């Protein structure tokens, strides 16, 4: 279960502590999302197109309810690029999941995310100090060590789809930096992306085979770990430089692996413990090091008053 973080309790924290808390909750949401997708797609409980549609539609409905409950909240300005990237990420990830195994999936997906967000950060003038680069190298090495036993050559189509998912997620994350109202922005993105997913489902109607369990897992993923989780991520991004935001996402695979041990009865291993220590220790080193250049989120994109 995701911890309950209310806006009032978060606002009372110091800025640095608030950013750490929001980032930690977002990473937990992403890891939980990974487990829900694994349960639904791995066992063929639902087809890829239906999974994506249910995730985006349920997320849009959940966020519409939350936004409507907020008094005096102005309607969000349409961000079609962010919505398109959200749809592309969900669709490409769902289809690639069926053709790329778990061990190969993580390096491709997170590699594409890192390259996209690092390129944007470097272009904006962000730079790591030497300890930051050491921490990043340790985190990447830990990820590769975690997944190395099961790495195999994926299909070319799977590589393209998973890489596209990573790039789309990187761009979607970058669009969230500097937003004044993460909730309204995320709600608007889901609202615009949902019809795209429904159109894709219509194209693949012949493969339609959701079970009740698969549909419930997709709805839980969309309404909670995607919808609410992405709001928390956008809130955290207000205070994270692009390169640091990229680095912290490397924590998702070990968190998901630990969740599988706790909730899916998978066996803990020394490999998981060592890799998790390397990844989390490396990320801590990245966050503790001072960055050179433009590190403010607004350096990449002008402040948005949405």
Language-model regions, residue ranges each:
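Glycine-/small-residue-enriched transmembrane alpha-helix faces in small-molecule transporters
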Residues: 1-53, 84, 88-92, 141, ...
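Transmembrane alpha-helices of multi-pass small-molecule transport proteins
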Residues: 2, 44-88, 112-120, 168-172, ...
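C-terminal-most transmembrane helix of multi-pass membrane proteins
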Residues: 2-12, 56, 250-306
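Juxtamembrane helix-entry segments on the extracytoplasmic side of multipass membrane proteins
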Residues: 15-20, 44-53, 74-76, 133, ...
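Specific transmembrane alpha-helical segments of multi-pass solute transporters/efflux pumps
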Residues: 29, 70-110, 118, 138-145, ...
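Specific alpha-helical transmembrane segments that line the substrate/conduction pathway
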Residues: 50-61, 86, 94-127, 165, ...
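Hydrophobic transmembrane alpha-helices of multi-pass small-molecule transport proteins
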Residues: 63, 86, 128-148, 165, ...
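Helix-helix packing/entry segments at the starts of transmembrane helices
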Residues: 105-112, 175-194, 226-262
């Amino acid at each position: 279960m995701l911890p309950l973080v209310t806006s009032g309790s978060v606002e009372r924290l110091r800025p640095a502590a608030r950013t750490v808390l929001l980032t930690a909750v977002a990473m937990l949401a992403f890891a939980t999302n990974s487990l829900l997708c694994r349960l639904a797609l791995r066992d063929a409980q639902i087809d890829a197109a239906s999974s994506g549609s249910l995730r985006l539609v349920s997320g849009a409905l959940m966020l519409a309810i939350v936004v409507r409950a907020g008094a005096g909240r102005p309607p969000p300005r349409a961000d079609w690029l962010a919505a398109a990237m959200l749809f592309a990420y969900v669709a490409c990830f769902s289809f690639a999941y069926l053709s790329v195994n778990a061990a190969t999936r993580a390096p491709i997906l997170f590699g594409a995310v890192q390259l996209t967000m690092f390129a944007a950060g470097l272009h904006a003038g962000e730079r790591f100090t030497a300890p930051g680069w050491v921490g990043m190298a340790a985190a990447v090495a830990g990820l590769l060590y975690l997944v190395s036993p099961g790495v195999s050559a994926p299909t070319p189509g799977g590589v393209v789809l998973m890489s596209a998912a990573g790039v789309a997620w990187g761009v979607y994350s970058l669009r969230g930096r500097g937003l004044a109202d993460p909730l309204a922005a995320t709600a608007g993105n889901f609202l615009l992306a949902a019809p795209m997913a429904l159109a894709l489902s219509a194209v693949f109607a012949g493969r339609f085979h959701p079970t009740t369990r698969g549909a419930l897992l997709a709805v839980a993923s969309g309404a909670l770990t995607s919808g609410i989780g992405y709001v928390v991520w956008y809130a955290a991004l207000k205070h994270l430089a692009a390169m640091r935001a990229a680095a912290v996402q490397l924590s998702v695979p070990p968190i998901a692996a630990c969740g599988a041990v706790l909730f899916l009865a998978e066996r803990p291993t020394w490999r998981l413990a060592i890799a998790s220590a390397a990844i989390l220790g490396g990320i801590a080193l990245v966050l503790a090091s001072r960055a050179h250049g433009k590190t403010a989120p607004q350096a990449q994109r002008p402040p948005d008053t949405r």
